[in-house]
């Protein structure tokens, strides 16, 4: 007997409920026009990398725990003397999530991490890029449950970019609201 294939909770919710809600709201001519999540990119820049070259590796380990996937170490493209950065010097880590891992991360972000952010008043509804992608920043990476607070020697911020197939910001905003993103009023 074949086992049932695992499907993330938010993906199931998208297929069963969110697609229908988006179709009713925007009345698309074709079912393929309904926007969906494409990918989530998480970037963690480590400014202290100029002083200690081990910092990006530690940040990458934390990012791997958060994302559930090994990140790539980002390197400086060119030298900037003012920042004491040399070309090819490791300066951060980033990871691109797609498929099931993307939906799992989104579920943890919206339901666990964002409510744990200090003085959180909602996400800025203007943080869209004009092409249906949403960007946000988190100042402390310890809001994620995978990070053990006692073992953290330094806190890093991170940028989270949610890429959708929506063509306008209004469509993307409606899609993310259906995914329970807590936008500011």
UniProtKB/Swiss-Prot annotation:
Q: Kindly state which keywords UniProt assigns to this record, in alphabetical order.
A: Ribonucleoprotein, Ribosomal protein, RNA-binding, rRNA-binding, tRNA-binding
RNA-binding listed as a keyword: yes
Q: Got a GO cellular component term for this one? A: ribonucleoprotein complex
Q: Which GO terms describe its molecular function?
A: rRNA binding; structural constituent of ribosome; tRNA binding
Instruction: Set out the biological process GO terms recorded for this chain's protein.
Output: translation
List the InterPro entries hit by this protein, alphabetically. Ribosomal_uL5 (IPR002132), Ribosomal_uL5_bac-type (IPR020930), Ribosomal_uL5_C (IPR031309), Ribosomal_uL5_CS (IPR020929), Ribosomal_uL5_dom_sf (IPR022803), Ribosomal_uL5_N (IPR031310)
Q: Which family does it belong to?
A: Belongs to the universal ribosomal protein uL5 family.
Record's function text: This is one of the proteins that bind and probably mediate the attachment of the 5S RNA into the large ribosomal subunit, where it forms part of the central protuberance. In the 70S ribosome it contacts protein S13 of the 30S subunit (bridge B1b), connecting the 2 subunits; this bridge is implicated in subunit movement. Contacts the P site tRNA; the 5S rRNA and some of its associated proteins might help stabilize positioning of ribosome-bound tRNAs.
Query: PANTHER family this protein is in?
Result: 60S RIBOSOMAL PROTEIN L11-RELATED
Subunit-level organization: Part of the 50S ribosomal subunit; part of the 5S rRNA/L5/L18/L25 subcomplex. Contacts the 5S rRNA and the P site tRNA. Forms a bridge to the 30S subunit in the 70S ribosome.
> What is the name of this protein?
Large ribosomal subunit protein uL5
Q: Which gene encodes it?
A: rplE
């Amino acid at each position: 007997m074949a086992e049932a294939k695992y499907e993330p909770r938010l993906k199931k919710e998208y297929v069963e409920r969110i697609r229908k809600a988006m179709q009713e709201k925007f009345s698309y001519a074709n079912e393929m026009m309904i926007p969906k999540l494409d990918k989530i990119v998480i970037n963690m820049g480590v400014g202290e990398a100029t002083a200690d070259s081990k910092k990006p590796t530690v940040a990458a380990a934390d990012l791997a725990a958060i994302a559930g996937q090994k990140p790539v170490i980002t390197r400086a493209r060119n030298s900037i003397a003012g920042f004491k950065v040399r070309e090819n010097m490791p300066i951060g880590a980033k990871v691109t999530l797609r498929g099931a891992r993307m939906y799992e991360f989104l579920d943890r972000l919206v339901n666990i991490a964002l409510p744990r952010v200090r003085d959180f008043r909602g996400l800025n509804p203007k943080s869209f890029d004009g092409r249906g992608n949403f960007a946000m920043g988190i100042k402390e990476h310890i809001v994620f449950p995978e990070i053990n607070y006692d073992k953290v020697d330094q806190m890093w911020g991170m940028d989270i970019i949610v890429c959708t197939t929506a063509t306008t910001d209004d469509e993307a905003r409606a899609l993310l609201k259906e995914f329970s993103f807590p936008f500011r009023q």
